[in-house]
From Swiss-Prot:
Name of the protein in its database record: Protein FAM131B
Residues bearing the modification Phosphothreonine: T325
PTM-bearing positions, type Phosphoserine: S47, S114, S117, S327
Domain of life: Eukaryota
Region (Disordered): 1-22, 222-339
Family: Belongs to the FAM131 family.
Disulfide bridges in this chain: none
The keyword Magnesium is assigned to this record: no
InterPro entries listed in its UniProt record: FAM131 (IPR026782)
Entries under Pfam families matching the protein: FAM131 (PF15010)
Gene expressing this chain: FAM131B
Length: 339
């Protein structure tokens, strides 16, 4: 009786257990909850590590089964989804068959994949993932090598730039040392550098405009200035230098003629002969009343006259700054002290 009652109870218990076993459907994914539902009552009675492990295992099994059914499904591969791109080994190769047979080839491949077992599908899936990781690693290594080459090229360019800057600094220091040299040896060194004209045939034209300075104060005076005219310290403040007319400083001083006596247009020192010479030189383009006009020109004087007429206004530092080292007006208005 007890055995029959126990059997009857068991028979009554089985349908109730089967009724509690349901299938959960969510967005087309059939997740079987049989194992989880059967384990839950046991966990309530005996909550131990074994029961928790069994629940975790059953949950993982359900998730993996859903992934196999819906992610690695052959229909998804046939439709060209991401799973097909990961799993299929020959996705990047160009097909050797004709285009009209491509659909048949895809169908055969799909059938062949469907015939594989679960272990073979998992192995194929892992092989595809490892291949993708290998491709990514190789790409990263190639990028890192290219970055290393770029860094080496940049370092080489920086080294060349440093060498250029050092050479430029040495050049500037040598020019400054030359500018600070005594005036005794200036003609030979400057003539050797090609900064002065040595002939009297034609006017000298400089190719580099950065080395051109304003003409010196005595460069456009008459050729007989050193022979026939008195020195600057013997002239008074009101006596102008030889070779100037009363109206010529007006262009330099902005039209102010109160500084020099005399009538405009009359040469006070040279006379008509000197005025005629200056007109000829002005027509030839080698003379200007202003020291800042026609800077590339040098008067066609002899070598000695050209080298000794303006030594104080032709230092390398002055040529670099393009301005004379001595002022023009003090030489005319103030007597210089004898050495």
């Amino acid at each position: 009786m007890d055995s029959t009652s126990s059997l009857h109870g068991s028979s009554l218990h089985r349908p109730s257990t089967e009724q509690t076993r349901t299938d959960f459907s969510w967005d087309g994914i059939n997740l079987s909850m049989e194992d989880t539902t059967s384990i839950l009552p046991k966990l309530k009675r005996n909550s131990n590590a074994y029961g928790i492990g069994a629940l975790a295992k059953s949950s993982f099994s359900g998730i993996s089964r859903s992934m196999k059914d819906h992610v690695t499904k052959p229909t998804a591969m046939g439709q060209g989804r991401v799973a097909h791109m990961i799993e299929w080994q020959g996705w990047g190769k160009t097909p050797a068959i004709q285009p009209q047979h491509s659909h048949e080839a895809v169908r055969r491949d799909t059938d062949a994949y469907s015939d594989l077992s679960d272990g073979e599908k998992e192995a194929r899936f892992l092989a595809g993932v490892m291949e993708q990781f290998a491709i990514s690693e190789a790409t990263l290594m190639a990028w890192s090598s290219m970055d290393g080459e770029d860094m080496s090229v940049n370092s080489t360019q920086e080294t060349l730039g440093c060498n250029y800057s050092d050479n430029y600094q040495e050049l500037m220091e040598s020019q400054d040392a030359l500018a600070q040299a005594p005036m005794d040896g200036w003609p030979h060194s400057y003539v050797s550098q090609g900064m002065y004209c040595l002939g009297s045939s034609d006017a000298w034209e400089a190719s580099d405009q950065s080395l051109i300075a304003s003409p010196a104060t005595g460069s456009y005076l008459g050729p007989a200035f050193g022979d026939s005219q008195p020195s600057l310290h013997e002239m008074g403040p009101s006596q102008p230098a030889s070779g100037y007319s009363a109206q010529e400083p007006s262009s330099l001083l902005g039209g102010d003629t109160d500084w020099a006596p005399g009538v405009g247009g009359v040469d006070l020192a040279g006379g008509p002969a000197e005025e005629e010479k200056r007109k000829k030189m002005r027509g030839a383009g080698t003379w200007s009343p202003s020291p800042h006009a026609r800077t590339p020109r040098c008067p066609p004087l002899s070598a000695g006259r050209c080298l000794t007429s303006h030594p104080q206004a032709c230092s390398p530092l002055m040529r670099r700054k393009a301005r004379p080292t001595t002022s023009f007006l003090p030489l005319l208005t103030q007597p210089s002290t004898p050495a």
